[in-house]
From Swiss-Prot:
Site residues, Important for the endonuclease activity: 88, 103
Coiled-coil segments on the chain, per record: 4-71
Region of interest called Interaction with host UBE2I/UBC9, as start-end residue ranges on this chain: 188-191
Chain positions covered by the region annotation Viral panhandle binding: 1-175
Family per similarity comment: Belongs to the hantavirus nucleocapsid protein family.
Enzyme class: hydrolase
Region (Homomultimerization): 1-79, 100-125, 377-425
Protein species of origin: Puumala virus (strain P360)
The keyword Metal-binding is assigned to this record: no
Keyword annotations from UniProtKB, A to Z: Capsid protein, Chaperone, Coiled coil, Endonuclease, Helical capsid protein, Host cytoplasm, Host Golgi apparatus, Hydrolase, Nuclease, Ribonucleoprotein, RNA-binding, Viral nucleoprotein, Virion
Protein's UniProt name: Nucleoprotein
Pfam hit, one: Hanta_nucleocap
Length: 433
């Protein structure tokens, strides 16, 4: 509907309807105050929905009106015979044609897209919901994340569950969990939840619940995360007791041999790392940790906690703030991100194509994780990541899922049968299984 007259008529009609609807809403509110029965409550809810729908439609028509006026101005603008726009500063026409007009009115430069999120506000918002809706939303944004993002890109979605509701004047209403699904051009507010921020905060707050329900992101499944977390307490305990190549203790004469051996262990290096982290706290993250400690969240306070690796089960894009001051946790996430890059490099290497096509299939999970985590105020200890790689790198690579689980003999036999049948029914080249 591009005609200005028609749009103006629709705006006038909807404004009149909105006046009537708001009056009916006031009457319904008074009726509920006098007789708060189910009939009046349902009527009130219906009136509220009607007003909301009319307001949305009116706003849409006003946007259309603004667009139509803008287009009309552009159409009536006199064109310069030289082909130069009237406000262009060039004296002669450029060799480049004029492209799109990029509208930057919606961008707030006080809150650039690369900013650090307001983790305290985000954490308080998420903790205010029931566990079921949080975990179901996490499942939709991790296990089924690619599909959910694809279907809802560029919108602000609402998760709804019967366990999440609030009572307003005796009326039970759904309490929606809002998550923004940005595009590359979107500018996010500091307190706005995106899929990446949601996975980060929920993984950090509720790793035990995630472990019990075995919620896992596909990108973690294919690097053998299930194998890694099996017998984690024993695995990390053995790791801590091994000799650390980066420690050379200054031993005084007469020191017992047992104490000398202890001072060379990984555990001592982690204790030193913990001392460094304890001096680098950020006030907002400390507030979040204190707030979380007073409620249901189960954030690990030690790398040896049984639920510690489950913080990364849903592939958060940085170390969750609730465990960023636990020695070795941020580095464990970096170790997982390197494994993801290693698997993608293997997959890219075995595919057929040019070197450029193969490079496109590589990833940079590690660089992204490193940048995002360090923006939260800590520097990762590369030596700890190296210790993890030396200890578990080989066995993790052996447990990668590389999409080639078929036995070579079985594959060869199946391919020969395919080739034979294709030759019988056509003269086309058979595809590879």
């Amino acid at each position: 509907m591009s005609d200005l007259t028609d749009i103006q008529e629709e705006i006038t009609r909807h404004e009149q309807q909105l006046v009537v609807a708001r009056q009916k809403l006031k009457d319904a509110e008074r009726a509920v105050e006098v007789y708060p029965d189910d009939v009046n409550k349902n009527t009130l809810q219906a009136r509220q929905q009607t007003v909301s729908a009319l307001e949305d439609k009116l706003a849409d028509y006003k946007r259309r009106m603004a667009d139509a006026v803008s287009r009309k101005k552009m159409d009536t603008k006199p064109t310069d015979p030289t082909g130069i726009e009237p406000d262009d500063h060039l004296k002669e026409r450029s060799s480049l044609r004029y492209g799109n007009v990029l509208d930057v009115n919606a961008i707030d430069i006080e809150e650039p897209s690369g900013q650090t999120a307001d983790w305290y506000t985000i954490g308080v918002y998420v903790i205010g919901f029931t566990i079921p809706i949080i975990l179901k939303a996490l499942y939709m944004l991790s296990t089924r994340g690619r599909q959910t993002v694809k279907e809802n890109k560029g919108t602000r979605i609402r998760f709804k569950d019967d366990t999440s509701f609030e009572d307003i004047n005796g009326i039970r209403r759904p309490k929606h969990l809002y998550v923004s699904m940005p595009t590359a051009q979107s500018t996010m507010k500091a307190e706005e939840l995106t899929p990446g921020r949601f996975r980060t905060i929920v993984c950090g707050l509720f790793p035990t619940q995630i472990q019990v329900r075995n919620i896992m992101s596909p990108v973690m499944g294919v690097i053998g995360f299930s194998f890694f977390v099996k017998d984690w307490p024993e695995k990390i305990r053995e790791f801590m007791e091994k000799e650390c190549p980066f420690i050379k203790p200054e031993v005084k004469p007469g020191t017992p041999a047992q104490e000398v051996e202890f001072l060379k262990r990984n555990r001592v290096y982690f204790m030193t790392r913990q001392d460094v982290l304890d001096k680098n706290h950020v006030a907002d993250i400390d507030k979040l940790i204190d707030y979380a400690a007073s409620g249901d969240p189960t954030s690990p306070d030690d790398i040896e906690s049984p639920n510690a690796p489950w913080v990364f089960a849903c592939a958060p894009d940085r170390c969750p703030p609730t465990c960023i001051y636990v020695a070795g946790m941020a580095e464990l996430g970096a170790f997982f991100s390197i494994l993801q890059d290693m698997r993608n490099t293997i997959m890219a290497s075995k595919t057929v194509g040019t070197a450029e096509e193969k490079l496109k299939k590589k990833s940079s999970f590690y660089q992204s994780y490193l940048r995002r985590t360090q923006s939260m105020g800590i520097q990762l200890d590369q030596r700890i990541i190296l210790l993890y790689m030396l200890e578990w790198g080989k066995e993790m690579v052996d447990h990668f899922h590389l999409g080639d689980d078929m036995d070579p003999e079985l594959r060869g036999l199946a391919q020969s049968l395919i080739d034979q049948k294709v030759k019988e029914i056509s003269n086309q080249e058979p595809l590879k299984i």
